Amino acid sequence: MAVVVVQEGESFEKALKRFKKICEKEGIITEMKRREFYEKPSVKRKRKQRAARKRLIKALKKKGLL
């Protein structure tokens, strides 16, 4: 859980920026967006397969094999 203790004399904008940075680092926003709507297991499986295929193609292009 993201917790930001505001230092004495610290501006609100600076504290908010630190909070956003912590949330990004912990993946809270990404997780929230992923859980916003129910995803059927078949759709989840297809999404993961697509991502794996995309990573494979990217790796092959980087090696110059594709």
From Swiss-Prot:
UniProt GO cellular component terms: ribonucleoprotein complex; ribosome
One of the protein's GO biological processes: translation
Record GO terms (molecular function): structural constituent of ribosome
Keywords: Ribonucleoprotein, Ribosomal protein
Keyword Nucleus on entry: no
Pfam families noted in UniProt: Ribosomal_S21
Gene3D superfamilies registered for this protein in UniProt: Ribosomal protein S8 (1.20.5.1150)
Keyword Ribonucleoprotein included in the entry's annotation: yes
S-S pairs: none
Name by which UniProt lists this protein: Small ribosomal subunit protein bS21
InterPro entries found in the cross-reference section: Ribosomal_bS21, Ribosomal_bS21_CS, Ribosomal_bS21_sf
Protein family membership: Belongs to the bacterial ribosomal protein bS21 family.
Taxonomic lineage: Bacteria, Pseudomonadati, Aquificota, Aquificia, Aquificales
Species assigned in the record: Persephonella marina (strain DSM 14350 / EX-H1)
